[in-house]
């Protein structure tokens, strides 16, 4: 009987810890590129495009960047064009 009580106590204490951690994590809602005064998605703007590329040179998914599907497609096309025109590297060098 003591073992079952200890197991239930540890399970509840772990559940409380997880719930407490989730309280402090607030995710921004909405697309950062759909707000007023947002920068225009263009292949000639590498400063904007590099924010949506990982350290290894891969395009970040929308679940990480929180960009809507329409803007994500525009970003992907702009990044591809910028790579072809050598405005962005295909693979980033390790520093």
From Swiss-Prot:
PANTHER family: 30S RIBOSOMAL PROTEIN S18 (PTHR13479), SMALL RIBOSOMAL SUBUNIT PROTEIN BS18M (PTHR13479:SF40). This is Small ribosomal subunit protein bS18. GO terms for biological process: translation. InterPro entries: Ribosomal_bS18, Ribosomal_bS18_CS, Ribosomal_bS18_sf. The keyword RNA-binding applies. Part of the 30S ribosomal subunit. Forms a tight heterodimer with protein bS6. Binds as a heterodimer with protein bS6 to the central domain of the 16S rRNA, where it helps stabilize the platform of the 30S subunit. Coiled coil: none annotated. One of its GO terms (cellular component) is cytosolic small ribosomal subunit. Pfam families: Ribosomal_S18. One of its GO terms (molecular function) is small ribosomal subunit rRNA binding. Keywords: Ribonucleoprotein, Ribosomal protein, RNA-binding, rRNA-binding. Belongs to the bacterial ribosomal protein bS18 family.
